[in-house]
Amino acid sequence: MQSRLSWIFNPKTGKTVMLAFDHGYFQGPTIGLERIDINIAPLFEHADVLMCTRGILRSVVPPATNKPVVLRASGANSILAELSNEAVALSMDDAVRLNSCAVAAQVYIGSEYEHQSIKNIIQLVDAGMKVGMPTMAVTGVGKDMVRDQRYFSLATRIAAEMGAQIIKTYYVEKGFERIVAGCPVPIVIAGGKKLPERETLEMCWQAIDQGASGVDMGRNIFQSDHPVAMMKAVQAVVHHNETADRAYELYLSEKQ
């Protein structure tokens, strides 16, 4: 377990920059992910960890790619129906066979299928403990729910109490440090919808400054006009403690 966790978090900084491109499991070929082999593969070398589905790992990610992989382990839903109605979509045997460093599943606290999503996390944690595979719980939010500190404090703590070793959640401007303080395992932030590059870097800096252990971003990287430059700027914030202003200057210089 600790060995795999050390693949995720840089031993010098204790932090990580994950590149998420698992969106197709419920969104299909969303903007920027139509051709992963063309648009996403050039970004691999600039990430600490990749996050994808086993289908994409097998069919698109080159076998020689020397990066740890977090495998999406929940699915069976789409944007056409209730998003929270997920099932475990990956066996632990396959996760081990594919040499993943962790498995990830959504947890939808307060949603119609809250109970099932928590059971999914428990199932993965139990199976993972037998083979030393960490589980990352990803806090999903229903469309009618308020994205605030109170909600994410509840969701992250429940996921940690169920045994998840890492939590992926959203940054909130008010009270994020309380979310981190109340969660006994590392938190990485999701990027969420596409923002202007300067705003994304500010969000990264604020999250790291308030105790996050890294970022797991997708659209704010691969939908950028200059994704490689954006990856380098995010790395500067997470691992080199650069401010958002300094990181944005780096982004501007790298995009030339």
UniProtKB/Swiss-Prot annotation:
It holds the Pfam family DeoC. Its EC number is 2.3.1.245. One of its GO terms (cellular component) is cytoplasm. Keywords: Cytoplasm, Schiff base, Transferase. The keyword Ligase does not apply. One of its GO terms (molecular function) is transferase activity. It is an enzyme of class 2 (transferase). The keyword Transferase applies. It is found in: Cytoplasm. The active site is at K168 (schiff-base intermediate with substrate). SMART domains: DeoC. Disulfide bonds: none annotated. It catalyses: dihydroxyacetone phosphate + acetyl-CoA = 3-hydroxy-2,4-dioxopentyl phosphate + CoA. Involved in the degradation of phospho-AI-2, thereby terminating induction of the lsr operon and closing the AI-2 signaling cycle. Catalyzes the transfer of an acetyl moiety from 3-hydroxy-5-phosphonooxypentane-2,4-dione to CoA to form glycerone phosphate and acetyl-CoA. Homodecamer. Belongs to the DeoC/FbaB aldolase family. This is 3-hydroxy-5-phosphonooxypentane-2,4-dione thiolase.
